[in-house]
Amino acid sequence: MTQVAVVNVQPTKNFMEVAFNLIQYKEVKQGNIGLDKLYELVGCDSKMIERVTLGELPNGNYLDLIIDEEGTFGQWNRGIHIKNANNDKITVLGNCVFVQSTIEGDWIGWNSEEKMADAIRPYTYKIKFFELAEKEA
């Protein structure tokens, strides 16, 4: 079974419920991740995405964080701050997906949750979930 790690900010649930299930492991059939599968995983209708390369993995692939072009995947009020072991920081509003990027440019998942967690861990030393205050009318 091939899987990817999806950050799901779950806007319909309360803040504490989301914190315990923020990163979810999702199955990807056939191993290669196409755009349609990414949109399905994050519930996105915009069809415009951006890749943030977090670093090189021990297997020669790269760890990419896939977000929509506006950084939201349709969710404007919640997100994550990611800090890696070097204290580099990235802020993402909404849902996102961690994938491996091959030298050929394909996005692929992992065959083991343990290997996936080991690959992601150095680049996500600290993940902080946040919620923006709602605007007053």
PLM features per residue range, with description:
Residues 1-137:
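Short beta-rich binding modules
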